[in-house]
Amino acid sequence: MAKIQPKVQGDERDDGLREKMIAVNRVTKVVKGGRILGFAALTVVGDGDGRIGMGKGKAKEVPVAVQKAMDEARRKMVKVPLKNGTLQHEVVGKHGAAKVQMMPAKDGTGVIAGGPMRAIFEVMGVTNIVTKSHGSTNPYNMVRATLDGLRKMSTPAEVAAKRGKSVEEILG
């Protein structure tokens, strides 16, 4: 198995992506000879224009785990349709016991979101949004619930195509 070298200072990629680390957990594997310590990292990567990806990485050292998570997040990026720095419409995302409600907001509102959700919207480029989380506050489940809700969001063009109308009729 190939070893991934930890990222050293100044070894920044010039791909224009924003990276945020959400959580690092210390994990322990108990074996016959004692305990083996490791680390698990949860990160999000975005381009500031609606693309977002989540990654998890595990390793014996924190920098290696974070780098693995960042690489996975880059590979799993999805495009979310934004409208003037906010969402198209209200959406609800669920994962496990975590339920996340996201509502578009007017200019000047800012990002009203807690914990892991704030990191997602900052790297994604959302500037005005109001969110509320219900149930589980586990960072992994909150991130997955947020991404679930963002994947459910549809553009006015998609809604118009489903209804057999023009975009102007949908927007009123």
UniProtKB/Swiss-Prot annotation:
Q: Where in this chain does the record put each S5 DRBM domain?
A: 17-80
Q: Example GO molecular function term?
A: structural constituent of ribosome
**InterPro entries, sorted:** Ribosomal_Su5_D2-typ_SF, Ribosomal_uS5, Ribosomal_uS5_bac-type, Ribosomal_uS5_C, Ribosomal_uS5_N, Ribosomal_uS5_N_CS, Ribsml_uS5_D2-typ_fold_subgr
Claim: Signal is one of the keywords in the record: no
**GO cellular component labels:** small ribosomal subunit
| Alphabetic keyword roster | Ribonucleoprotein, Ribosomal protein, RNA-binding, rRNA-binding
One biological process term from GO is: translation
Which is an annotated Pfam family here? Ribosomal_S5
The family assignment reads:
Belongs to the universal ribosomal protein uS5 family.
Per the record, the domain comment is: The N-terminal domain interacts with the head of the 30S subunit; the C-terminal domain interacts with the body and contacts protein S4. The interaction surface between S4 and S5 is involved in control of translational fidelity.
Fill in the subunit field for this protein.
Answer: Part of the 30S ribosomal subunit. Contacts proteins S4 and S8.
Q: What does this protein do?
A: With S4 and S12 plays an important role in translational accuracy. Located at the back of the 30S subunit body where it stabilizes the conformation of the head with respect to the body.
Q: What is this protein called?
A: Small ribosomal subunit protein uS5
